[in-house]
């Protein structure tokens, strides 16, 4: 029968044997709790965030492999800002503030999965996500920070 792939979005460190994973894994004959515990161990760094997970099961040998994706940029920014959700009125109301170091940290996390050509380009994308969430950067609006990035003010952060 070959390989079976099960893709799901789970809460980091909080996957359970309930839906969607348990019912999908059951018919494949693997130890469900062993798989769930392995997922929770691999996603513990993303605690509380939605993380894409793919479980690949060889239905003949019952061996499995777990691939962990990266949470969305918005989820990573909200974690850095210490907020649960965005402002709801981005551009006029502000839900939080992050440092440029936090933006660079998120940009580095997203860099390998991005189509952008440089860390600076990814950082500008992350600042755009900050705007959508209503999160300021270094106490300034994301539009001001984008202008500063374009002027080269933050270039030392992107080395």
Swiss-Prot record:
Q: How does it assemble?
A: Part of the ribosomal stalk of the 50S ribosomal subunit. Interacts with L10 and the large rRNA to form the base of the stalk. L10 forms an elongated spine to which L12 dimers bind in a sequential fashion forming a multimeric L10(L12)X complex.
Q: What does this protein do?
A: Forms part of the ribosomal stalk which helps the ribosome interact with GTP-bound translation factors.
Give a yes or no for keyword 4Fe-4S in this entry: no
What keywords appear on the UniProt entry?
Ribonucleoprotein, Ribosomal protein, RNA-binding, rRNA-binding
Know the name of this protein? Large ribosomal subunit protein uL11
Gene name tied to this protein: rpl11
Gene3D superfamilies reported in the protein's UniProt record: Ribosomal protein L11, C-terminal domain, Ribosomal protein L11/L12, N-terminal domain
Q: Which GO terms describe its cellular component?
A: large ribosomal subunit
Q: Which InterPro entries does this entry report, sorted A to Z?
A: Ribosomal_uL11, Ribosomal_uL11_C, Ribosomal_uL11_C_sf, Ribosomal_uL11_N, Ribosomal_uL11_N_sf
Task: Say which species the protein is native to.
Answer: Nitrosopumilus maritimus (strain SCM1)
Query: Is Iron among this UniProt entry's keywords?
Result: no
Recall the GO molecular function terms of this protein's record: large ribosomal subunit rRNA binding; structural constituent of ribosome
What's any GO biological process attached to this entry?
A: translation
Q: Specify the taxonomic lineage.
A: Archaea, Nitrososphaerota, Nitrososphaeria, Nitrosopumilales, Nitrosopumilaceae
UniProt record similarity statement: Belongs to the universal ribosomal protein uL11 family.
Q: Which Pfam families match?
A: Ribosomal_L11 (PF00298), Ribosomal_L11_N (PF03946)
């Amino acid at each position: 029968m070959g390989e079976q792939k099960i893709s799901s979005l789970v809460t980091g460190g909080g996957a359970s044997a309930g839906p969607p994973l348990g019912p999908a894994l059951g018919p494949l004959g693997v130890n469900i709790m062993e798989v769930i515990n392995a997922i929770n161990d691999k996603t513990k760094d993303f605690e509380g965030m939605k993380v894409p997970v793919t479980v690949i099961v060889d239905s003949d040998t019952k061996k499995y492999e777990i691939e962990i994706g990266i949470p969305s940029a918005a989820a990573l920014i909200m974690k850095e800002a210490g907020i649960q959700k965005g402002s709801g009125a981005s551009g006029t109301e502000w839900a939080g503030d992050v440092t440029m170091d936090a933006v660079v940290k998120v940009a580095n996390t997203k860099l390998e999965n991005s189509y952008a050509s440089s860390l600076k380009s990814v950082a500008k994308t992350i600042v755009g996500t900050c705007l959508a969430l209503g999160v300021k950067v270094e106490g300034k609006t994301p539009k001001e920070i984008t202008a500063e990035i374009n002027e080269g003010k933050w270039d030392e952060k992107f080395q």
